[in-house]
């Protein structure tokens, strides 16, 4: 965490990045590839850059495998919350959402999508409707709306059984205390 805190002192960008469901955007997901290509051209293969990209690219699959260990996905509706690659922006470029969506479609899983900042992928028009009939919440993006709205009371009222917190921004202890299965990606 000290390293992450130190990274917030950089004179560009918007805040820190934490381990989670994957990275996106026009820089973090792309710039390492340029550095890797330049390194290879200079005669050096940057294993750590490749390993980092492989790890980040595998997070959507890891997330779905984690869910499959808990429940039969075809028998449980999933509420996918968030499309953009980070909270409180309307930029979906390189977001892990797209890999999550592709996997869920391939597996023929019933799911809803809601993002208050980027509505082009929404299948419903509110977080309330996204959770209707869902048993699983899969949080992809840490929008403030989600952090405020996804309370234990809300989850209980919607009869949610499992929460996959892809950004580690929800109240883990309170969720678990209520008997809801909680898994944080990157914890």
Predicted regions and their residues:
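Structural/interface elements that position substrates and couple domains in central-metabolism enzymes
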Residues: 1-187
